[in-house]
């Protein structure tokens, strides 16, 4: 009954020392989140408010998108609409080509990961430099993010130190001190900022009432990406638009507390228009399936997500299997749901990567019903033609047993004879349960028989 996720998780767990470190690291972030939440008496009210704002905005998205675009254009920005990833990449390339851009620096953006923008631009001869430290590390390593907020969390300081030595960023061989490595990365990135022809940012929020793009970072790289080059391109998904600054105040109090256990991000950057001496600012609003997802009655609330990553930090499966065990580029509970919205045939294997503990729903700052949605996806696998045939057979057998009182009574009466089966026969490859579990010992008397005996 293996899935792509379970097979990848098995590889992840081969290094038990690393697996335990990974689990403990993310649980510590979850603990920091809890401490921050407990420090605000109004935390649950904020969650309710944030959820209500998102529900309202998404169900009136056409109005707010029109308002945002109108105000952005009044500010002097050039607004583009991209229906899918292909059109988005084409728009970005066209803008860069018109300005003879050879190198572009960019701050963190999961949207560009979604649209696979970097490899597209590189195939056109344009160098793209990630400026978020974690993103830069995995870019140099040729990897994808393993977490949406902490993309290089799966690497330790020795991994990074060796990488920096290989790339010529670090000059002191064997010096893997994090402070030193950060210093060397800063020097390297400073040169990239100063020699770039264009800068790109994503956006945590788009403010409809003003046309502003708001970017939250801890490193200030979004500011550097827009202050040094003369051309600024901002790209956001349609769902990132919110009504006004009063709404932003709610999300600003929650985003970082939920994601990393900090009171707020170090930098909150507001972009309304280009600098006086710069080229006009370009804003790209990307659909790429979102308008279709809004029409899904059971799963549209996944669009409320503000990409804080708290569902991953708390998820017992993500913590013990890693981000690369998932087939979708966003891992964890939110990634399971978004992946299924994207392509049920490709990502159905992820829905088993959930214990239905609902911890993700407990911590989500905008109250996305992540676990409930995963449960709903599981009920639909047979309709999609992606249900596991072994599980289907097992469920039919269980239905037969529990649907017949006689068969059930016979099974419970004879169950203890299974204790006599030699262990090598039970704990073999033909019994998936034996991997990671010990077979239970069946009592001689089933529970209902014990109760009847007590009642005599």
Describe these PLM feature segments.
Residues 305:
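Phosphate-binding glycine-rich loops and their immediate beta-loop-alpha structural context
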Residues 1, 5-25, 39, 394-456:
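Intrinsic disorder at enzyme termini
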Residues 275-302, 318-427, 435:
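Ferredoxin-type iron-sulfur electron-transfer modules in oxidoreductases and energy-metabolism complexes
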Residues 84, 311, 369-370:
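Helix N-cap / loop-to-helix initiation motif
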Residues 1-298:
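The feature marks the mature, well-folded catalytic cores of soluble enzymes
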Residues 308-312, 357:
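Extended amphipathic alpha-helical segments enriched in small hydrophobics
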């Amino acid at each position: 009954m293996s899935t792509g996720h379970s097979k990848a998780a098995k590889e992840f767990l081969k290094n038990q020392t690393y697996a335990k470190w990974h689990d403990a690291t993310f649980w510590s972030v979850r603990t920091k989140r809890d401490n921050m939440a407990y420090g605000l008496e109004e935390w649950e009210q904020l969650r309710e408010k944030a959820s209500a704002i998102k529900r309202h905005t998404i169900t009136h998205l056409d109005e707010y998108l029109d308002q945002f675009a109108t105000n952005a254009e009044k500010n002097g920005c050039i607004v583009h609409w991209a229906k899918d990833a292909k059109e988005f990449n084409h728009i970005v390339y066209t803008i860069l080509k018109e300005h003879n851009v050879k190198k572009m620096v960019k701050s963190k953006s999961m949207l560009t990961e979604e649209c696979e923008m970097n490899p597209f631009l590189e195939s056109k001869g344009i160098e793209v430099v990630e400026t978020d430290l974690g993103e830069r590390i995995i870019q140099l390593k040729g990897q994808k993010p393993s977490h949406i907020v902490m993309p290089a969390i799966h690497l330790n300081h020795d991994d990074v130190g060796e990488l920096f030595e290989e790339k010529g960023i670090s000059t002191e061989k064997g010096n893997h001190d994090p402070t030193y490595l950060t210093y060397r990365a800063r020097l390297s990135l400073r040169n990239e900022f100063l020699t770039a022809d264009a800068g790109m940012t994503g956006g945590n929020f788009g403010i409809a009432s003003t046309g502003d793009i708001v970017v939250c970072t801890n490193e200030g790289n979004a500011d550097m990406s827009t202050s040094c080059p003369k051309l600024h391109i901002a790209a956001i998904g349609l769902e990132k638009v919110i009504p006004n600054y009063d709404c932003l105040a709610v999300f600003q109090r929650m985003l970082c507390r939920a994601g990393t256990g900090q009171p707020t991000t170090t930098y909150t950057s507001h972009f309304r228009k280009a600098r006086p001496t710069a080229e006009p600012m370009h804003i790209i609003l990307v659909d790429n399936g979102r308008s279709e997802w809004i029409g899904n009655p059971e799963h549209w609330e996944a669009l409320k997500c503000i990409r804080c990553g708290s569902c991953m930090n708390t998820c017992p499966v993500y913590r013990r299997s890693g981000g690369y065990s998932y087939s979708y580029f966003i891992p964890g509970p939110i990634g399971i749901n978004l992946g299924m919205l994207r392509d049920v045939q490709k990502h159905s294997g992820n829905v088993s990567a959930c214990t239905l503990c609902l911890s993700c729903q407990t911590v989500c700052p905008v109250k996305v019903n992540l676990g409930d949605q995963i449960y709903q996806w599981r009920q639909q696998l047979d309709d999609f033609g992606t249900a596991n045939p072994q599980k289907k057979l097992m469920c039919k057998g269980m239905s037969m047993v529990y649907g017949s009182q006689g068969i059930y009574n016979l099974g419970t009466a004879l169950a203890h004879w299974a204790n006599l089966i030699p262990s090598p026969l039970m704990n073999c490859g033909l019994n998936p349960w034996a991997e990671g579990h010990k077979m239970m010992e069946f009592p001689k008397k089933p529970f209902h028989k014990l109760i009847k005996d007590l009642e005599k």
